[in-house]
Amino acid sequence: MKVLIVSRTRMSTARCIGGLASDGTSLRLLTSSGNNHDTSSPLLVGQLWDLTYSPISQFIAPHVEDVLLSTQQFVDVKIKPKQYILQRVSPWEGSIDKIFGGLIEYTANNSGYVSERSGVPDRSTGFWIPDSDLRLRVDGQHYDYMTVIKRFGRKFHTFQEAREWGIANPGGTITKSPDGRWYIVKDVTKSKESIREMNGYPLRGLKYVGEESPIKVIPAGTLVRLSLARWWRPEDSEPNFEERCYLQLSGWY
């Protein structure tokens, strides 16, 4: 089967390699022994390969894409990944709320995950076209989905400017966008208390695990690949702490 390599996820000294078959099937390519590949694997993002593989005997949801790779033959590098992908799959489009069936929850540090409690999606990989920028955090390891609401289509670049508008237009609440601009959100009250309450802006993020160096901003409308990490919980966690699959960004096209 012809397979486009769409991701190489960093895993210490190994790589979790993702592929998209010519029939639109999403694959997580494991070695014939069921392990992740070495960093020296010749399977590189953007390359087309002719692969022979078989599904593993037993998978643990949501990681239904696991296959055992038996043979590989290089085919081509003259592939346009975005075009290839969009011809075969229908990506999620719009808000981050739409990915993985809306089952993603977020930690206090704004990192997305799923758990048995929140519900397990029917897959662990997917493509997404976000309606807002994804901005790199200062840690250089996570991206945040930058929600922007323009209910009335008015922008304000300073709090004072926004507050003056709120005073002149009773019933307007003001909330700050992550990039520092102010937007009118909805009609409720013009009080200072309401303005202060709306001063916070919840971020929702995901870890970047691709090999390519991260960029500061992935613009809205960019096709990106998402995945859910294997089930995990910290070794030093409480006995009743739930296992989770954390949300990851594999790359963009």
What are these regions (language model features)?
Residues 32, 42-44, 64-66, 239-240:
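Surface-exposed beta-strand edges and their flanking turn/coil or helix-capping segments
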Residues 56-69:
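Short, Lys/Arg- and Gly-enriched loop/turn segments at beta-strand edges
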Residues 71-81:
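Short, charged amphipathic alpha-helical surface segments
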Residues 10, 24-26, 58, 74, ...:
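Generic "edge-of-domain/loop-turn" microfeature
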Residues 1-54:
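N-terminal ordered "arm"
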Residues 46, 67-69, 87:
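Generic alpha-helical propensity signal that fires on short helical segments
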